[in-house]
Amino acid sequence: MKKSIVFFEAKGGSDKGPDGYRKDTMPMVNALKAKGWNAEVIFFTDDILRNESERNKIYEEAKAKFDGYVSRVNPGNLKEEKLYFDVLRKLCDAGLVGMPHPDAMIGYGAKDALTKLRNTELVPTDTLAYYEPNEAARIGVKWEAGGEHDFKKNFPKTLAKGERVLKQNRGSTGEGIWRVRLEDASAYGKVDLLPLDTKIICTEAKDNHSENRQLGEFMDFCEVYLKGDNGMLVDMTFLPRIKEGEIRILMLYKTPVYVVHKKPAEGGDAFSATLFSGAKYRYDEPKDWQSLIDWFLAQLPEIRSKLGNYDLPLIWTADFILDTDKNGADKYVLGEINCSCVGFTSPAEFMEKIALMVGDNIVEIVEGAKK
């Protein structure tokens, strides 16, 4: 074993500090060095990825020098993400330990992960994922006209029953996440299929602004979210208790590190838990949410098996919203998993401690894989 790890980053982007690195990268590098390991950062750009010889140069260097890689590339920072994933996949095939494996990034990080978990305690059974036929074929999903993955056939049915949330797969900070409800709240449950001229109110999580639209026109607008590789929409029940806050668990591999309580702005149609939209964040110890933590950790084996049986990501988050069960008791619903490039720069006092824990986890993962 070489006792050597490479961190992959993308040049540029709003997630970088003045030194050009992500703010949480060098603390992890230094934590590994303090344990007697070598750690280096290699940058990717779209130009490098498009250039086969440059791409291969990084591959050969990484294969020769390192036991594993840690991917610190934010979704959207590289247009050539597919080529980047190809490099990572090739490195995993060559024996490097992927943190995470690119297919695990897709499995855990794509919004349709929720539909793979809908027959568990975590996700409501009426959660659906919509694709264009070509994208469904590319990712191995069976698409049929009028079937469960057909957006325009299904959304008028799900919305007829109650308020929904539509989430695009790409984007961040709430862009392309819409709360959709009928203008006439008394009309739910009256028909199985809403007509296309049904008047609806759409609120975007980006900034909580609302728009009055017609159902057919809004669905036409949403087709942009289905275009291209990884294009999809996830359709979920709207949970009104989001007003009480979203609960995010930051995980290091199998260990919860802290919990963020994200309370949406007060008033109006606000439902977004993003800072940009005015949500307030509070950072808690895992023990402050012990019942949620214990329940979630008990679900990890099933989550792992249903999302492709890849190892858990190195750094990842799970977001929960409160709901009420049929007996009137609290229950938690999984709203999203993030794993592509989760940061831990806030709160600042946690960063060094978490970086040391990440270093310990990297060593444990690599040593376990190399045995």
Stretches found by the model and what they are:
Residues L78-K79, P100-R118, D126-N154, L159, ...:
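Domain-scale recognition of functional cores that engage charged ligands
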Residues M1-V6:
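Extreme N-terminal starter segment of soluble prokaryotic enzymes
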Residues K287-D294, A298, R304-T317, I321-K371:
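C-terminal active-site "lid" helix and adjoining low-complexity regulatory extension at the edge
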Residues G12-G146, K153-N154:
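Conserved N-proximal alpha/beta basic substrate-recognition cap immediately N-terminal to
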Residues G162, R170-K306, V333:
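Phosphate-binding site of ATP-dependent enzymes
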Residues F7-A10, L252:
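Short hydrophobic segments within beta-strands
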Residues G12-G13, D47, P75-G76, M105, ...:
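Short, solvent-exposed loop/turn segments at secondary-structure junctions
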Residues Y69-R72, V165, V234:
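Structural motif
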